[in-house]
């Protein structure tokens, strides 16, 4: 059986990595990135829940009078 020639694998792998790096660099450089991003100002809406309008007293067992 003939031996597999692996002498060119290093050059192929390095050239592939270099090509991928250059390709991704070119793709990323074409994107627009804002220089100073600021958060959007959205109006704060207060959700009205029925339990927020009522006052309820919670009785704990320790605050009850002794019998």
UniProtKB/Swiss-Prot annotation:
The modification N6-succinyllysine is found at residue 54. Its main location: mitochondrion. It comes from Phoca vitulina. This is ATP synthase F(0) complex subunit 8. Subunit 8, of the mitochondrial membrane ATP synthase complex (F(1)F(0) ATP synthase or Complex V) that produces ATP from ADP in the presence of a proton gradient across the membrane which is generated by electron transport complexes of the respiratory chain. ATP synthase complex consist of a soluble F(1) head domain - the catalytic core - and a membrane F(1) domain - the membrane proton channel. These two domains are linked by a central stalk rotating inside the F(1) region and a stationary peripheral stalk. GO terms for biological process: proton motive force-driven ATP synthesis. GO terms for cellular component: mitochondrial membrane; proton-transporting ATP synthase complex. The gene is MT-ATP8. The modification N6-acetyllysine is found at residues 54, 57.
